[in-house]
Amino acid sequence: MSDIASRVKAIIVDKLGVDENEVVTEASFTNDLGADSLDTVELIMEFEKEFDIQIPDDQAENIATVGQAISYIEEAKK
């Protein structure tokens, strides 16, 4: 697991209070991990802070799964 992936997963576990084993690449923040829209916004803000990136709102709307978050951040950090 990449450093980015492990940091993303740690943020999700911390913010959503879910078990680390539930945070798999294909897990949806809302459908699988129980996040509501406010939780999702807070996750995006935490990703921005942790990785020192900006995620525009139109892009944030496309980040619905753990894997999508990891991919977006890996691309943004290149």
Swiss-Prot record:
Main location: cytoplasm
Pfam family membership, one: PP-binding
Signal peptide extent: none
InterPro entries with a match to the protein in the record: ACP, ACP-like_sf, PP-bd_ACP, Ppantetheine_attach_site
Main function: Carrier of the growing fatty acid chain in fatty acid biosynthesis.
Protein family: Belongs to the acyl carrier protein (ACP) family.
Identification of the protein by name: Acyl carrier protein
Organism: Flavobacterium johnsoniae (strain ATCC 17061 / DSM 2064 / JCM 8514 / BCRC 14874 / CCUG 350202 / NBRC 14942 / NCIMB 11054 / UW101) (Cytophaga johnsonae)
